[in-house]
């Protein structure tokens, strides 16, 4: 599972997901991509599930690029704990995704294979997304 090797601070504020993604919204490496249409936190488990789905479908052919990285810790308090006594401990990591952000890229395969593989990965994501291809 993806997570940072080290961070400056153990815990982070939740923050807000305003506006569109101004970075990471163009295809850079492959020919086909999965683009987010909604804002969300995508967990490291969901990213890994999508990556595995694409890899399994594409088998040996092609190359896959994961364009998001979970760098935000999400804290949870233990169940049946009273309020107070500080913030909970970090439980898992999420990537903050805004609309327009590229999640996965694919290259070296035909469009039909890429479309099918990316649609399987899209079903593993908690948001609506679209298949896009590099216009040359």
UniProtKB/Swiss-Prot annotation:
Pfam families: Ribosomal_L16 (PF00252). GO terms for biological process: mitochondrial translation. Transmembrane segments: none annotated. Its main location: plastid. Residues 1-20 are annotated as: Disordered. InterPro entries: Ribosomal_uL16, Ribosomal_uL16_bact-type, Ribosomal_uL16_CS, Ribosomal_uL16_dom, Ribosomal_uL16_sf. CDD domains: Ribosomal_L16_L10e. One of its GO terms (cellular component) is chloroplast. One of its GO terms (molecular function) is structural constituent of ribosome. Part of the 50S ribosomal subunit. Belongs to the universal ribosomal protein uL16 family. This is Large ribosomal subunit protein uL16c. It comes from Agrostis stolonifera. The gene is rpl16.
């Amino acid at each position: 599972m993806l997570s940072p090797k080290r961070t400056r601070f153990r815990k982070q504020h939740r923050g807000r997901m305003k506006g569109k993604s101004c970075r990471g919204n163009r295809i850079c490496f492959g020919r086909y991509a999965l683009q987010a249409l909604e804002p969300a936190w995508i967990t490291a488990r969901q990213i890994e599930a999508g990556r595995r789905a694409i890899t399994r479908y594409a088998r040996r052919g092609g190359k896959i690029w994961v364009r998001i990285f979970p760098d935000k810790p999400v804290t949870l308090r233990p169940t049946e704990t009273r309020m107070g006594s500080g913030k909970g401990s970090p439980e898992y990591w999420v990537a903050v995704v805004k609309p327009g952000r590229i999640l996965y890229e694919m290259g070296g395969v035909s469009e039909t294979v890429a479309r099918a593989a990316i649609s399987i990965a899209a079903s593993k994501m908690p948001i609506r997304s679209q298949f896009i291809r590099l216009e040359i």
